[in-house]
């Protein structure tokens, strides 16, 4: 049986670094699973659009697609935007929407990879406070998930972990940095819980001016690519609801 095509659904951005990072991540996914067809579509700003990719797949005779939101939390885009776009797909396509990437232990591993690349070592954990800096959301579920991830991560040995948000929610990154200083952590690191560079990650970076360490975005980290494949495999389970025919 032919495997469903994996369609990675990215938000898109006017910042060219965003699309470049998405494409680099997709190339890593392809390298991890040769033979799996992986396509990329954007909701806005970049091409190809999700709708355009779906129409092209339909014209080729593809019938089975897993649409994977390139999102870390289940907020508005995953709940409303993406289902609305998929509902407009050609009726002959059978489309299953996969779960968003987070939360996942692999993403915590990717965050730590970025912190170590920025200069920390495992020996620094107990004396380092970390700001888990996300893009932000007005969705209560997404906010609660970020807070839960911070609590879970704290139990892996860090001095403390505080969530922060670049938009829509509080606290901001700079406030979380100050809180960790007040707790007495010997050093403070900021770990952006975002997938690609852009406007909000740049805001996180500015808010990290008072920190000792600023990690890079998650980007094409190997652990992120593995999460994509996990979500793809999970969506292939027949009991998941399909969008379309």
Question: What are these model-predicted stretches?
Answer:
Residues 1-245:
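Active-site-proximal alpha-helix that buttresses catalytic centers in soluble enzyme cores
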């Amino acid at each position: 049986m032919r495997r469903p095509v994996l369609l990675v659904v990215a938000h898109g951005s006017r910042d060219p670094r965003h699309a470049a990072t998405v494409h680099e991540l997709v190339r890593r996914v392809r390298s991890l699973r040769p033979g799996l067809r992986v396509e990329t579509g954007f909701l806005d700003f970049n091409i190809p659009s999700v709708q355009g990719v779906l129409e092209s797949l339909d014209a080729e005779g593809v019938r089975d697609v897993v649409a994977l939101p390139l999102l870390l939390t289940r907020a508005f885009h995953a709940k409303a935007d993406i289902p609305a776009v998929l509902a407009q797909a050609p009726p002959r396509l059978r489309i299953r929407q996969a779960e968003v990437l987070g939360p996942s232990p692999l993403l915590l591993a990717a965050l730590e990879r970025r912190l170590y690349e920025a200069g920390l070592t495992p020996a620094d954990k107990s004396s380092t406070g970390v700001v888990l800096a996300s893009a932000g959301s007005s969705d209560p579920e997404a906010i609660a998930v970020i807070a839960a991830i911070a609590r879970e991560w704290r139990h892996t040995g860090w001095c403390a972990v505080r969530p922060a948000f670049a938009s829509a929610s509080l606290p901001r990154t700079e406030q979380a940095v100050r809180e960790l200083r007040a707790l007495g952590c010997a050093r403070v690191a900021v770990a952006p819980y975002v997938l690609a560079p852009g406007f909000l990650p740049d805001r996180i970076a500015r808010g990290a001016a008072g920190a000792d360490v600023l990690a890079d975005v998650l980007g094409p980290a190997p652990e992120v690519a593995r999460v994509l494949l996990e979500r793809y495999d999970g969506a292939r389970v027949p009991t998941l609801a399909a969008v379309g025919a």
